[in-house]
Each structure stands twice: as structure tokens, then as C-alpha cells.
Regions:
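Bacterial N-terminal signal peptides
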Residues: 9-20
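Formylglycine-dependent sulfatase
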Residues: 2-4, 23-268
Length: 268
């Protein structure tokens, strides 16, 4: 038998063996997005000292931290339209807030492509993409959506949104109290001792807002830690790509809706 035919047989056997393995085991990585609303990079891993964020800091220490990550729009749905499609807002026609754009027929939200590749895709539970997402975007998109509901061995793409840090959590008394209800006394902030950004007026109202921002971040870090703990308990952590990011800067003046650093620079 000549070398050419031997090589063809060897390649065929290798391909057959690989195909057989693929049928019994899918070792493609899982992907988990952790997305808090309205959050600047006020974390220990970015040099913040006023609060402790151990779970996000541990992610950064064990992974890849971007120090100059910017979104292409400083407000939620406009930004999210780009993340879910991989295209600029001006390309999609989603650059005007609350415009309810219609996607070009050739554009697919990328979870559809993951589903076509065999992934179980869930969103828990914010969409707000500036357009009506096609029904086939997600296997599940609601407050119960979770990787636990996939088939055995099926790779997953799971999105978890934390709305507690939204600007309404700073401005709204009841929401702020609800989100921060489980904080320990040591995790509370004294508004009188906080260092404000230099562009804010030093008034009691501003200090209270900045205090609430910090405490909401602390609550979010605990929530993120719970997701990571669950991944480990389910034996998925080592084969999961975890991406932590926010849609834009903090929900305060000169941040959210602001086109410069404080509105567009995010933790990633």
C-alpha cells in the first residue's frame, strides 16, 4: 500500500474516532455572563478602597482584567443592542433610546447562533435590546431561566442580570432598602467620610447617593458570589467562561448617559 493511501486511511480513522467521541461527550466550554446594571469600575481590583468586593476581585485575580474597557453607548438598551448582535448601534439603527428599531433581516442576535450550534441559552431576565428580539433567541428568558434546566451534558450560555444597581436603586428608597437588606453593619457606609469624585458638589444629598451606590455594589458582589458558588457546586466552574461586565457607568449625573469616561468605561 502506498504512502498516499495509508495517509488517507489514517485520516479517515482519526476523523471517525473524533466523531464518535463527539457523540458521547461535549466538552465545549459553558459561557456565563454576569451583568449588573449601571456600574462603574468601583471594585477592589480596580483600586477602589472604600468597599470590599471579594467575589469580583477573585474573578479578576484568576482571569483576565481589562483596565480600559469602554462601551459604545452610555445608556442601557442602546448599549445592549450592540452586545447582543456584535454590531454598532449606528449600523443597526438602535442609537436613539427607546426607538424600538427593526433589525435588518440578515442580523441575528448571537444566542441564536449558539443555539444552532447545540448550546442551551438562557437569559435571567432583562432584555431591553432596543428591538423586539426574535422568539428563537433564547431557550428560556424569564426569572427562572437557569443552566440547571438544560439537557445532561449540554453546553450552556447563561445570562444573569442584576437590576439592583440600576439608578432606580439609588433614587428609590424602597428599592435601595430591599436590595441592601442583607448587608452586615460593617458593610454599611458613612456618607460623611466618603471621598466624592471631584466633579460632584459636596452636599448631603450627593453623599447619600454615593453611599447608596457603594452599598448596592456590595450587595451585587454577594449576589455574583452566589452564582459562582453554584457553578462550583454543579461541577461546571472549571469548564465555564465567566464574563463580568456592566452596560455603562453608574446611574448618577455625569455618568449614565454621559459620552465620556465616567459614562462609558466599565468593569470587564
Amino acid at each position: 500500500m502506498d504512502w498516499f493511501n495509508l495517509r488517507r486511511i489514517a485520516l479517515f480513522c482519526f476523523a471517525l474516532a473524533f466523531a464518535t467521541v463527539s457523540l458521547v461527550a461535549d466538552d465545549r466550554p459553558n459561557i456565563v455572563w454576569i451583568i449588573p446594571d449601571d456600574m462603574s469600575a468601583n471594585f477592589g481590583c480596580y483600586g477602589e478602597t472604600a468597599i470590599e468586593t471579594p467575589h469580583v476581585d477573585a474573578l479578576a485575580a484568576g482571569g483576565l482584567k481589562f483596565t480600559n474597557a469602554y462601551v459604545t453607548a452610555p445608556v442601557c438598551s442602546t448599549c445592549r443592542s450592540a452586545f447582543i448582535t456584535g454590531m454598532y448601534q449606528t449600523t443597526l439603527g438602535t442609537h436613539h433610546m427607546r426607538c424600538n428599531a427593526k433589525l435588518p433581516s440578515f442580523v441575528k442576535p448571537f444566542p441564536i447562533l449558539l443555539r444552532e450550534a447545540g448550546y442551551y441559552c438562557t437569559n435571567n431576565s432583562k432584555t431591553d435590546y432596543q428591538f423586539s428580539a426574535p422568539r428563537e433567541t433564547w431557550d428560556a428568558s424569564n426569572g427562572r431561566a437557569h443552566w440547571k434546566n438544560r439537557k445532561a451534558g449540554q453546553p450552556c450560555f447563561a445570562v444573569f442580570n442584576f437590576g439592583g444597581c440600576h439608578e432606580s436603586g439609588i433614587a428609590g428608597e424602597s428599592k435601595y432598602r430591599s436590595v441592601t437588606a442583607n448587608l452586615k453593619p460593617s458593610q454599611r457606609q458613612d456618607p460623611g467620610t466618603l471621598k466624592l469624585p471631584p466633579y460632584y458638589p459636596d452636599t448631603p444629598v450627593v453623599r447619600e447617593d454615593w453611599k447608596r451606590n457603594y452599598e448596592l455594589i456590595t450587595a451585587m458582589d454577594a449576589w455574583a458570589g452566589g452564582l459562582i458558588k453554584q457553578l462550583k457546586a454543579d461541577g461546571l466552574y472549571e469548564n465555564t467562561i465567566i464574563i463580568f461586565w456592566s452596560d455603562h457607568g453608574v446611574g448618577l449625573p455625569r455618568a449614565k448617559r454621559w459620552l465620556y469616561d465616567s459614562g462609558t468605561r466599565i468593569p470587564l
